[in-house]
From Swiss-Prot:
InterPro entries: Protamine_P1. GO terms for cellular component: nucleosome; nucleus. Cross-linked by interchain disulfide bonds around the DNA-helix. This is Sperm protamine P1. Disulfide bonds: none annotated. GO terms for molecular function: DNA binding. The lineage of its organism: Eukaryota, Metazoa, Chordata, Craniata, Vertebrata. The gene is PRM1. Testis.
Length: 50
């Protein structure tokens, strides 16, 4: 299952897949179906899958 990161509306083409490398910065991770929900509602962000 690929996890997706939320990106800012300014750079909506820049959505990164969350890799399992040690990154301390945790942003809201979105799944396929919940991508539009978690990113759009609270943070007004767009989630895109590569």
């Amino acid at each position: 299952m690929a996890r997706y990161r939320c990106c800012r509306s300014q750079s909506r083409s820049r959505c990164y897949r969350q890799r399992r490398r040690g990154r301390r910065r945790r942003r809201r991770t979105c799944r396929r179906r919940r991508a539009s929900r978690c990113c759009r509602r609270r943070y007004k962000l767009t989630c895109r899958r590569y």
